[in-house]
Amino acid sequence: MANKSASLRPDSKNHFLAMRLEGLFKTVTVRTAAGQTEPRQSLREIGRDQVSFTFENVRGTLVGFRQPHYLQGVGIAGDHLHFITEDRKKGGHVLALESDGEVEVKAAQMYTMTLELPKGDQEFNEATLVGSHKDLKAVEG
């Protein structure tokens, strides 16, 4: 896996990288949050109820992005991957993974980004969108 992940390092730390890994994984550890129980809960509140699972000898797909650090806040800087099993019944946010090599790796460096915001949405207009870096670290690690 280390050899394949080295090929995912783009020649620029300032571009996005889209990734897809598909195959047999020795282990994949994921976490899943329970979801909101009321509107506008903070990320930290939602993250308190997350649970972790480790799948062993599992086939599935990981998809995600490597986001440049200067865009922290628009998204999550660094690697952000999600996993779903081949039968599409289990998955979550990837915390750790290990493979013996039966994995197909696809990646593409991205040079454009479009950010579309809601128009005419009063709730969005009044929302406090700046999150706490501490809350993000507590949930994302």
PLM region descriptions:
Residues 1-6:
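Hydrophobic alpha-helical segments and helix pairs
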Residues 7-65, 72-74:
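Long, positively charged binding patches that form subdomain-scale interaction surfaces
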Residues 13, 56-59, 75, 88, ...:
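A short, structural micro-pattern
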Residues 20-22, 31, 63-66, 82, ...:
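Residues in well-ordered beta-strands of folded domains
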Residues 35-37, 79-80, 98-99:
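Short, solvent-exposed amphipathic alpha-helical segments in soluble enzyme
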Residues 76-84:
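Histidine-centered divalent-metal-coordination microenvironment in nucleic-acid enzymes
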Residues 85-128:
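A hydrophobic, small-residue-rich beta->alpha segment in the mid-to-C-terminal subdomain
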Residues 119, 127-141:
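Well-ordered alpha/beta subsegment
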